[in-house]
A protein has these predicted regions:
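Secretory/export targeting leaders with adjacent low-complexity proregions
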Residues: 117-133, 139-141
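Conserved small/polar residues in nucleotide/adenosyl-binding loops
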Residues: 188-192
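A contiguous strand-loop segment
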Residues: 1-94, 121, 126
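Short acidic/polar capping segments at secondary-structure boundaries
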Residues: 80-82, 111, 122-124, 145-148, ...
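Compact, glycine/acidic-enriched structural inserts
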Residues: 36, 89-122
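Active-site nucleophilic cysteine motif
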Residues: 2, 133-134
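Extended amphipathic alpha-helical segments with heptad-repeat/coiled-coil character used for oligomerization
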Residues: 134-179
């Protein structure tokens, strides 16, 4: 099961596992500041933060699984099959296709606080990359050294949850993942 996790000491760490038996042709991918993102519904973005992460590059476009930008903001998409439901394009909102979501946030936001502002005016849509790449059903962890949030787009709309543990797995929905932590409340660490 894929898992994204944060770890804080005097430094901040962000990472994820990608538990597949085969490769989709993914590779470590760097998107420099001057790479032009051509968003399907929002046009071109020519100046942005640099991004590094794991992606499959198709037609010159990085389809990120997870990444971190130069400001230390990290983001990972994990399977959410059967629960993800994207919206239709809506006038007056910033319409972002699910495959553009990671670069949309990481290119423009330097913190989770700033990402929350972008999420407040964003509409996550199911526009496909092409006929070979249907919209992936995902939910996301966004984190920096201060906080983490989980983003889910369901039939109820776009939900942003505070994520106090800084961890996200594939299904089930985030609220159920948090509830299931009760199964482990008797575990503790000690110096003994």
């Amino acid at each position: 099961m894929c898992t994204a996790a944060t770890y804080k000491t005097k430094d901040f760490y962000f990472g994820r596992t990608l538990d597949y038996e085969f490769s989709y042709g993914d590779d470590v991918t760097v998107t420099p500041r001057n790479y032009v993102f051509d968003f399907r519904h929002e046009g071109k973005l020519e100046s942005h933060y640099a991004i590094v992460g794991m992606a499959h590059v198709a037609d010159g476009y990085p389809l990120y699984y997870d990444a971190v930008n130069e400001k230390g903001l990290g983001m990972a998409g994990l399977n959410f099959v059967g629960n993800a439901k994207y919206q239709e394009v809506s006038e007056g909102r910033e319409n972002v296709a699910q495959f553009e979501f990671i670069p949309w946030i990481l290119a423009q936001c330097g913190s989770v606080a700033q990402a929350r502002e972008y999420l407040g005016r964003m509409n996550l849509v199911g526009t496909t990359f092409n006929e070979h790449f249907p919209a992936a059903q995902l939910h996301w962890l966004i984190a920096d050294k201060e906080e983490a949030v989980t983003v889910e787009c369901t039939a109820s709309g776009l939900q942003v949850y505070d994520n106090p543990v800084g961890v996200l797995t594939n299904n089930p929905p985030f609220e159920l993942q948090m509830f299931m932590l009760n199964n482990y409340c008797l575990l503790y660490t000690s110096d003994a």
